[in-house]
Swiss-Prot record:
Residue ranges of every copy of the Pentapeptide repeat domain listed in the record: 20-59, 60-99, 100-139, 151-190, 191-230, 231-270, 271-310
Organism the protein comes from: Synechocystis sp. (strain ATCC 27184 / PCC 6803 / Kazusa)
InterPro entries: 5peptide_repeat (IPR001646)
Keywords: Repeat
UniProt-recorded name of the protein: Uncharacterized protein slr1819
């Protein structure tokens, strides 16, 4: 079928085009709101600036299709093959992208507010500047998760997004807005979160081993039981964060703000806390074996039963701190 015929039939009131084979079709700027093209073959199609709001494209083949600037608000793309598709600047607000394959897709500056991305594969996709506020990527069951491995999400807006159990290993989230996002059980190994906004984010049981968090804002975040070993966390702001039972083994926390944190039973062995601010921090039973605490600020911190035995404490300030033996340091 030619593009002209399809558009004409749609204008005449026909909307059902299930399973049509239309590879390479040129439908640039066509108005096809609510069209049903589920299971259609649209490989390499030109859908630039197309109006596809509420369209049904479930299970459709859109490999390498051009959907730049297209309007797909509330469209159904569940199970669609979107590998290497170009969605640059597209509107996908409230769209259903469940179980879709978006490997290596371009989603730069895309509006994905409230989109359903559960079980979607976005590995290697580019989402720079995309807005994913309130998007749902929550892991439903074991082995069924959204894959964002090595995805590029620099400066993306993910505020309040539900990303529980998502695979973000090696992803670029530098300067991303993850304020109050649900990142519970998330795999962020070797991810780049430099200068990311993680204020109030939920990161319980998350794996951030080897991640870059330099300059990130983690104020009031919940990092309970998170694995952050061998990570880069220089100049991080963790003020007021919950970090009980966190693993920070061999992590570089030089110059970080850890004041008013709750770090009871934290593993800080071999961590570098040079010039870190731990004022008023709760560090009951924290483990500091071979940690570098040079010039760290522990003023009024609670270090009851903490292990400081082999730590380097040259120039550290423990004024007003409650020491491991329960005694308050007065000088």
């Amino acid at each position: 079928m030619e593009a002209k015929e399809l558009v004409q039939r749609y204008r005449n009131g026909e909307t059902l085009f299930t399973g049509l084979k239309l590879p390479g079709i040129n439908l640039e700027a066509a108005d096809l709101i609510g069209i049903v093209l589920n299971e259609a073959d649209l490989r390499g199609a030109n859908l630039l600036f197309c109006y596809l709001n509420r369209a049904n494209l479930g299970q459709a083949n859109l490999v390498a299709a051009n959907l730049s600037g297209a309007s797909l608000n509330q469209a159904d793309l569940a199970g669609a093959d979107l590998r290497s598709a170009n969605f640059h600047g597209a509107m996908l607000q409230g769209a259903i992208l469940r179980d879709s394959d978006m490997t290596l897709a371009t989603l730069q500056d895309t509006n994905l507010i409230g989109a359903d991305l559960r079980g979607a594969d976005l590995s290697g996709a580019t989402l720079t500047g995309a807005c994913l506020r309130g998007a749902n990527m929550r892991q439903e069951k074991k082995g069924y998760y959204t894959n964002l491995q090595a995805a590029i999400l620099g400066r993306a807006d993910l505020q309040g997004a539900n990303m529980k159990g998502v695979d973000l290993s090696r992803a670029d989230l530098s300067y991303a807005n993850l304020k109050e996002a649900n990142l519970r059980d998330v795999d962020l190994r070797k991810a780049d979160l430099s200068y990311a906004n993680l204020k109030g984010a939920l990161l319980t049981d998350a794996n951030l081993s080897g991640a870059k968090l330099n300059g990130a804002d983690l104020q009031n975040a919940n990092l309970m039981r998170a694995k952050i070993s061998e990570a880069e966390m220089t100049a991080v702001n963790c003020q007021g964060a919950i970090m009980t039972h966190v693993n920070l083994n061999r992590t570089n926390l030089t110059g970080s703000n850890l004041s008013f944190t709750r770090m009871n039973s934290a593993d800080l062995s071999r961590a570098n806390l040079t010039k870190a601010n731990l004022q008023e921090a709760e560090l009951i039973e924290a483990f500091f074996a071979r940690a570098n605490l040079t010039e760290a600020n522990f003023i009024n911190a609670n270090l009851v039963r903490a292990d400081l035995m082999s730590a380097n404490m040259v120039g550290a300030d423990f004024q007003g701190a409650t020491m491991p033996d329960g005694q308050v340091r007065h000088h």
